[in-house]
Amino acid sequence: LETGNKPFLHKIIEDNPKILKKRLSVLIKRFDMIIFSGGASEGDEDHIKSVIEEMSGIIHFWRLAIKPGRPMGFASINRVPVFCLPGNPVAAQVCFRLLVEAGIRKRVSADKTDLFKIQVISKFEQKCKIGRKEFLRGKLYYEDGITYAQINGEPGAGVLTSLSGANGLIEIDEDIEIIKKGDIINFIPFKEALI
């Protein structure tokens, strides 16, 4: 909305490849960008990837080395971008903020597609898995003129309450094994936190 785009919320599409292909064929002609929520994984009822391939779409990536958000896809059909978000609510929100918002900005204007990040001081300790980037829901606060970040809520891609009260994402690079209190870390504030 803030970019001047007009979103259209489609009803839930049945987990049926024929129905999905029929609906996607119509949507591709009508809209400048398609965003799916769920169906991007590799279960028996996840058909989006195979339908896109069947429609001669180009799969740009499918699955990411991030947490949450591993089952995230990006494709295009007839030059229309198709984002396929994970089904878990927190993973979907994280991927939307990291990838889809950048895609929308790029479609509207090639300027400023990079994420806005600030460096803050960690007020927590966290073990991390090497080899994947991790995004924790976080909360900024100020103490004695210093900006700190704390983990907000419980971890997990399905724990929606971790977004409640969070005002950004704590970014942990794939080569970090542990975050200690006092470490300098990257924080990606939600836009509304900057207002």
Can you say where each PLM-predicted feature lies in the sequence?
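Loop/helix-junction capping segments adjacent to catalytic residues or to phosphate/diphosphate-binding pockets
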Residues: 17-18, 42, 93
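Short, ordered loop/turn segments at secondary-structure junctions
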Residues: 12-15, 39-40, 64-71
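Short acidic, glycine/serine/threonine-rich loops at helix termini
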Residues: 20-22, 46-48, 76
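Short loop or secondary-structure boundary microenvironments that flank
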Residues: 14-17, 38, 89, 153
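Flexible glycine/proline-rich
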Residues: 51-195
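Active-site-adjacent beta-strand anchor residues
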Residues: 10-13, 38, 85, 172
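Glycine-rich beta-strand-to-loop/alpha-helix junction loops that act as flexible
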Residues: 34-48
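Phosphate-binding glycine-rich loops and their immediate beta-loop-alpha structural context
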Residues: 1-36
